[in-house]
Regions:
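Beta-rich catalytic cores
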Residues: 25, 81, 129, 176, ...
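Residue-level detector of Asp-centered blade-edge/turn motifs that repeat once per structural unit
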Residues: 33-34, 89-91, 137-138, 184-186, ...
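Asp-box/WD-like beta-propeller blade repeats and closely related beta-sheet repeat scaffolds
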Residues: 1-28
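Short loop/turn segments immediately following the C-termini of beta-strands
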Residues: 43-44, 53, 99-100, 109, ...
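Surface loop/turn motifs at the tips and blade-to-blade linkers of beta-strand repeat domains
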Residues: 10, 19-23, 73-78, 121-125, ...
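Short loop/turn segments immediately following beta-strands, especially the blade-tip
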Residues: 1-3, 52-65, 107-114, 156-163, ...
Length: 230
């Protein structure tokens, strides 16, 4: 069972989009691969907040788990709407999907520092509904989901030396692909199509990154998130 919250962090601010960014709206928190930092994506204020993780904090002591980092946050372009963040398997790069602008931002990552190196479009129709982002286990390809219009997955190759993205394809999916996951062996990609009431199963070409629908849909009422148990 979960214990009561040991601490609560509150944020202030707003963003450029008056309908979607009237206040802070944390959409994802991610501990860095080195376990030393936590990044929190704030869709409402166009920021990635940074915290230092205290490894000595435990449920039975009074040590604070999170301490404000320096800088306290990283700002992205106004109206972007940062949603989900993921790290490359080598831990050297991070990638952010922006819900409102439909872009992916690539960062170099080193000991808590994010350095923006590229912005590339995942959504090219202005749907303002980009959703999830994941990298293949081999670190060669990145996938980003889009909803509301042209529902599907943008597919990018990742340059092995500098982490830069190149778009290599687009896979149309069922309606509202809110979340997806790549199987641990990298062979398949499962998409939670919320408004189609199915989890679609795609075979993944490990050489090209492209996807093939193998027509083995799993019927589920309003699927929104898929996780594998270690």
């Amino acid at each position: 069972a979960l214990l009561p919250a040991s601490e609560v962090v509150k944020f202030k601010g707003s963003g450029a989009d008056k309908e979607r960014q009237e206040k802070p709206h944390l959409h994802c928190v991610r501990i860095t691969p080195d376990g030393k930092y936590l990044f929190a994506d704030d869709l409402g204020t166009d920021q990635i907040h940074k915290f230092i993780v205290n490894p000595n904090a435990k449920a039975d002591n009074e040590d604070v788990f999170l301490k404000e980092g320096s800088p306290a946050s990283y700002k992205v372009e106004a109206g972007s709407g940062p949603r989900h963040l993921t790290f490359a398997p080598n831990g050297s790069y991070a990638y952010l999907i922006n819900e409102l602008s439909g872009t992916v931002i690539a960062f170099e990552y080193n000991d808590g520092e994010l350095k923006e190196i590229q912005t590339i479009a995942a959504d090219t129709v202005g749907a303002k509904g980009s959703g999830d982002i994941h990298i293949s286990p081999d670190g060669k390809f990145l996938y980003a989901s889009n909803r509301l219009k042209a529902d599907g997955l943008a597919i990018f190759s990742i340059h092995p030396e500098n982490g830069m993205l190149t778009k290599v394809g687009y896979q149309l999916t069922g309606i509202h692909p809110r979340n997806f996951i790549i199987t641990p062996n990298g062979k398949y990609l499962l998409v939670a199509c919320r408004d189609s009431n199915v989890i679609q199963v795609y075979e993944r070409d490990t050489d090209t990154g492209l996807l093939t629908d193998i027509r083995k849909d799993i019927k589920v009422d309003k699927p929104v998130c898929i996780k594998f148990v270690p």
